[in-house]
Amino acid sequence: MAKQSGADRELVIGSRGSILALWQAEYIKSCLKAQCGLQSRIQIIKTRGDKILDVPLAKIGGKGLFTKELEEMLLSKDIDLAVHSLKDVPVEFVPELDLAAITQRESANDCFLSVNYPNLNALPQGAKVGTTSLRRSMQIKKYRSDLDTLSLRGNVQTRLEKLHNGAFDAIILAQAGVNRLKINTQDVRYIVPLDFMIPAMGQGALGIEMRKDSIFFDRIAVLNDKQSALCVSAERAFVRTLEGGCQVPIGVYAQFSNNKLTLQAIVGLPDGSEVLQDSVEDSINIDDINASENLGIAFAQKFIDKGAKELLERAAKIAFA
C-alpha cells in the first residue's frame, strides 16, 4: 500500500507484468535511488490490454488499454507512480494526474526481425509480417503493398516464439524494446532498424505518471529529460489535435538540434493505399514546452485541412481485416 505518509517512506511503483515493463520499472527504481535518494518497490498490475490477447488492439476499442488500471491505482493512492512506455499513454489525463517526468529517449525506430530474411526488401511476395500496430501496417503496406500484415499480440517473448515457429516471416518491434531486452542476432538472425518508418508518439521514452498533489512529484521531476520532453510534447499535441489515440494509424516524430525542432508525420489507411505525409521545422528554445506544443497543434491543423480526420474515420472502420 502507498497510503502511508512521510517524505522518506518507501514508494510503490506500479508496472505491468511483462519482462519489458518490469525492466522499465526496475530502471526507474534505480534512478529514484541514485538521483532522488528514494527507496521504492514494484507492484505488478494487469491491464485490459494484457488480458485480451486474441483480438487486435485496434479492434478492442477504448483508451488507456495499457494504462487505465494503473491510473485507477494512482487515484486510490495504492501506488505512488506508474511507469509507462510513453507510446501507450493517452494524450488526455484525468485532472488529478500528470507526467512528473519523461526519461531520456532511447531509439525511436521500429525494427525488422526475421530468421530467414535479411531485410524488408528480401521478403517474398505475400510474406507474413506480424505487428500490433495499424501505424506500422500502414507504412509497411505503403512501402510494399504485396506483403501480408497480420495482427501479432503478446509480450516480446511470445512474439519471438511465433517468429521462430514459422507463423510469421518477419515481425516488427520497437527498437527500444529490442535494445532494453538485449535481443541480438543469437536470438534472431536479422535485426534491422526501419529508418523509413515514422514512429508512434513518444516511442522510445518512458513516462512517470503521478498524482499532481503527491509530495514526491517535484522530487521525481529531476528525472525529466528536457530534450525528450520537448520532442514528445510536440508529438502528443499533434495526436491530441487530430483526436487520435494510441491505436490509430498515426506516426509522428520530433527531433531537436541547434535550437530547431523538426516534426515529421504520417496519417493514413491501414492498407497504405491513402496517406498524408509532411514535415515542418521551427526555431524553439529547449525550455519552451508551450512553443513545442503549439508547433504540434499547428502542424496537425495542416493535416486536418488536408482531410486527415476523415481519413482516420475511414481507417477506424477498416482496422485489421
Curated annotation (Swiss-Prot):
The region annotated as signal peptide is none
Subunit record text = Monomer.
Its EC top class is transferase
> What is the catalytic activity of this protein?
4 porphobilinogen + H2O = hydroxymethylbilane + 4 NH4(+)
> What further note is attached to this protein's record?
The porphobilinogen subunits are added to the dipyrromethane group.
Enzyme Commission no: 2.5.1.61
Q: Which GO terms describe its biological process?
A: protoporphyrinogen IX biosynthetic process
Q: Which gene encodes it?
A: hemC
> By its UniProt entry, which PROSITE patterns does this protein fall under?
PORPHOBILINOGEN_DEAM
Protein source organism: Helicobacter hepaticus (strain ATCC 51449 / 3B1)
Q: Which family does it belong to?
A: Belongs to the HMBS family.
Q: Which residues carry this modification: S-(dipyrrolylmethanemethyl)cysteine?
A: 246
InterPro entries given in the database record? HemC (IPR000860), Porphobilin_deaminase_cofac_BS (IPR022419), Porphobilin_deaminase_N (IPR022417), Porphobilinogen_deaminase_C (IPR022418), Porphobilinogen_deaminase_C_sf (IPR036803)
- Fetch the HAMAP family from UniProt: Porphobil_deam
Q: Which GO terms describe its molecular function?
A: hydroxymethylbilane synthase activity
One Pfam family cited in the UniProt record for this chain: Porphobil_deamC
Q: What is this protein called?
A: Porphobilinogen deaminase
One CC-aspect GO term: cytoplasm
Q: How is the cofactor bound?
A: Binds 1 dipyrromethane group covalently.
Keyword terms, alphabetized: Porphyrin biosynthesis, Transferase
